[in-house]
A protein has these predicted regions:
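Surface-exposed, charge/polar-rich loops and edge strands
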Residues: 1-412
Length: 412
């Protein structure tokens, strides 16, 4: 079972929603954030280094304190206000004509520590520490984490009934993605949502492993500092948007490599033929069509690579992943890149940028070869999380990203 609760969300009045809401902190750099931030943008709170000239070190104490000052200022100005009642919220995102509906809720940090909230990625200590400082200083979860839950017909019915009413927010962001929010403040409905989730065996971290880990660390820290801790304090809970697993789509997460590890192009292609059926496609962009089929761009030409049977293990939840197949048979075996986390010879490109970004980076001379992968499925992600396994680095890319500042959870 998982413990969730409604909460008094801190959020912008309707007239400010589109301006306050921003892209999440980790999808744009400081220069981009400074250029993108308008007066009321949440970027001033989640990337406060942009308020210094020149842009300050994002990990400096003055920047962390500026975030606290800005959050306070936004509330004083009325750009963020706290709801009077504890609520759940329905948050809808529309991309390319397709809409997914998530429930905005608070989850209990101990469910993450116990494994009821399941992860599929490792976290980096430095990023985890950075997020923890933000949460601790703000006494708030400014940005939500992105969870999935097993489909539930009764929750679907509650969501459908809710979204049949006019939305509280309805705006289209600069990236053309649509965002809508509905408020569920009926006590009986809120109570029923809580009861249903108490029967759900697990939630799955889709995106936001560092924010989840940081929230859990702050919860544990507050517990340790409170001799009268009961487990129901507001600091025990953190902000999440949870979607039914069937509505989520993972898009491709691709690789570009700087060199061929001393091989000529002819030697490299010959080495690939040990484990792949290699087909030259030509100048037209080639998109992978199935699991174990890869797209490669080399010297102005696209190729189809299909892993031969026997080169992967369909019964191994990690070994069957295309990121594992590519890493084992190409990146490590041929190109000598053993550790994706530390190698400076490889970079990763989210599929939202399109395959044209791969050819652009190779044609520019920055990179030598590019690989596009068939996307991981939600079922693969859940199987890996359920078996306690960890996906290789840079495996999943979810789109659209949650907009930050639609709803905030304060535990002040």
């Amino acid at each position: 079972m998982v413990r969730i609760k409604p909460f008094q969300g801190v959020r912008p009045p309707k007239q400010y929603a589109a301006e306050v809401a921003s892209r999440p902190y980790d999808v744009l750099n400081s220069v981009e954030a400074k250029a993108e931030a308008t007066e009321r943008s949440l970027l001033h709170i989640i990337k406060p280094e942009i308020d210094f000239d020149p842009i300050a070190d994002e990990h400096s104490e003055q920047v962390y304190q500026k975030a606290v000052e800005n959050f306070r200022h936004w509330r004083e100005q009325g750009w963020l206000k706290q709801d009077e009642k504890e609520c759940y919220y329905v948050y809808a995102q529309t991309m390319n004509g397709r809409t997914q509906y998530g429930l905005v809720m608070c989850c209990h940090f101990e469910d993450y520590l116990s494994g009821a909230i399941k992860k599929h990625e490792l976290t980096r200590p430095d990023k985890e520490e950075d997020r923890m400082i933000h949460v601790r200083n703000q006494r708030a979860n400014i940005e939500p984490v992105f969870f999935a839950y097993p489909d539930n017909a009764e929750i679907d019915a509650i969501v459908a009934q809710t979204v049949a009413k006019p939305a509280e927010y309805d705006f289209t962001a600069a990236d053309t993605f649509g965002h809508q929010l509905w408020v569920i403040d009926d006590e009986a409905t809120c109570r029923r949502i809580t009861e249903i989730f108490a029967t759900i065996p697990a939630l799955y971290v889709a995106d936001g492993h560092h924010r989840t880990a940081a929230a859990a660390r702050v919860g544990a820290e507050c517990k340790a500092n409170n001799p009268n801790h009961t487990g129901e304090e507001e600091y025990c809970y953190f902000l999440a948007v949870t979607f039914p697993e069937s509505q989520l789509r993972i898009i491709d997460y691709n690789r570009v490599v700087k060199d061929l590890n001393g091989l000529t192009e002819e030697q490299f292609l010959a080495a690939l033929e040990d484990d792949f059926v290699v087909e030259k496609v030509g100048a037209d962009v080639y998109t992978p069509t199935a699991l174990h089929n890869f797209s490669m761009y080399l010297d102005g030409c696209w190729y189809s690579l299909t892993a031969k049977e026997g080169t992967y293990d369909d019964n191994d939840p990690i070994g069957v992943l295309d990121v594992t197949v590519l890493s084992n048979l190409v990146l490590d075996k041929i190109l000598g890149i053993a550790d994706l986390r530390t190698s400076k010879r490889i970079d990763f490109v989210g599929g939202i940028r399109g395959l044209g970004e791969l050819s652009r980076r190779v044609d520019s001379g920055e990179m030598k070869v590019a690989f596009a992968l068939y996307p991981v499925s939600m079922r693969q992600l859940i199987d890996i999380a359920d078996t306690g396994n960890i996906m290789p680095p840079k495996t999943t890319w979810f789109e659209p990203k949650l907009r930050s500042g639609v709803v905030i959870h304060s535990f002040e």
